[in-house]
Amino acid sequence: MSTSNDIRFSNDVLVNAERLINRDFNGIYLVLGSHIADLERIEDPTRRQLMSERFIRHFLPKDKVEPYTRKGKEFLARYWEALRMEGCSWLSENGSKYAGQALISGLALAISHLFPAPWNVTGSVLAIIASILIKAGIDVLCDQKQNTPP
């Protein structure tokens, strides 16, 4: 069984996750969905072309993009209540102590126990989810009425 100590975040993963915070939520869900699809080993020849959100949005037909966005949203929705509670708690205690990549990696480690394998040890997926939580903000995460992801 893997623990959060086994998770490694490459500099590229953290840089890209930090950039995602400035994107719209659908763009982040698109990237998350493509990573989830990779982990599920979905056989899709267009997946090899999904290099970045910009490439996806501008060069692939919408019917090739929407399934990945939907997959990202559905994945996050499954875990939203636990993520919201953990994110609220962790950001309340640590949000002012960290910034940028340190904030992303700290929150990613804090939420890793909420997911089954392989997602609980996949740094890129955890960093993307941490970016979504950071972008949503502490007000959204700590709102008891926020039943669905942004």
Please state what every model-predicted region is.
Residues 87-144:
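Membrane-inserting effector segments that mediate pore formation, membrane fusion
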